[in-house]
Amino acid sequence: MVTLLSVRPRRVTPTRVYRFYRGGLLIDRMRGQPGVDSEYPEDWVGSVTVASNPGRDEPLAGLSRLDDGSLLRDEIAADPEGWLGADAAGGSTGVLVKLLDPAERLPVHFHPDRSFAATNFGSAYGKTEAWIVVATRGEESEVWIGLREPVDSETYRGWIDDQDRASLLASLNRVPVRTGDVVYVPAGTPHAIGAGALIAELQEPTDFSIVCEWAGFPIRPEDSHLGIGWDAALSALDLRAHTPIRELPDAAREFFWADELAEPAGRFAVWIVLDGSGSVDGAPARTGDCFVVPAAAEQVEVSSGLRILRCLGPEPG
C-alpha cells in the first residue's frame, strides 16, 4: 500500500562516511560551510547500503536518514511499492550515490562485476560506477582509468606482490578532469582518483573494492582482496587495454543513469542540488541539499533557479 509519505520528495541529511583516506573539504564548501579535510571524505546520498570499513564496528555506517531522523532503509521496507515502484517492490533501490572529495590520491583498485560478486560474495550487485565532476580545488584534477596496454596476469600479480606502486599507476591511462566531466568505470577496470576533485559517484549498491596498492596507505594486506586471496581476486580484473569512456554510455542504463531533469522518473531517484537556491516541493533548497524522490511521486514543483542532478537506478525490465 502506497502511503502519503512515499509520494512526496524527502530531504536526506548528510551521511558522512569514514574512509581510509582524508578529504571532504569541497563537500562542506558546496554547502556554504568553511570546509575541512577529515577521515570522513564521503557523503552517501539516499543510501540503503552499509559501508564496509575493516576493524570498525559501525552497523549503520553509510545508511541515509530522512529529515525526521528515520532511516531511509526502514521507510522503504515499510512501503516498497511507493518508494521503488510495483516492479521493484520488496527489492533494492539498485543504486548508491556518493559525494566524495579526496585530498590525496587514492590507491589503484578495481571492483567485481555482478557474476563475480554473486559467486564470491553472494551479492546480486557488483560495482560498476561513474564519476561526475562537480568541482575541483584547482583548475583541474586527474584520474587514472584502465590499462594503457594489455598486461599479463603474472606481470600484474608481480606488481601487487612487490607493491610496485610506480608500475601500477604508470600502467593506467591518466585523464585530466574539470568541472562537468564524466568518466564511466566498468566493473573490473583498474583505476584511481586523484586529489582535489569533488565527484558525484553513481554505482551499484555495494562496497566491494579490491585494492592493488596498499603500501603507503592505512590498509592491511589481508584486507586488500576481500578475504578471497589474490589468485581468485585477479580473475575479476580486466587486463585488456582500455580506452577511457568520457560519458555515460547506453550500457550504463543497466546499472544507473544521471541527468539534469528535475522531474519524477516513475522510479526511485536521488536529487542533488548542484547550484542555486529556491524550493523543492515547497521545501527550501540550496546548493548541496539532497532529496530522495519516490517512484510514486507524480508531480514535483521545483524552482527554476535550481540546477539538479537526478540520479536513477537501473532501468526497469
Feature-to-residue mapping (PLM):
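Short acidic-glycine-tyrosine-enriched beta hairpin
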Residues: 172-184, 279-299
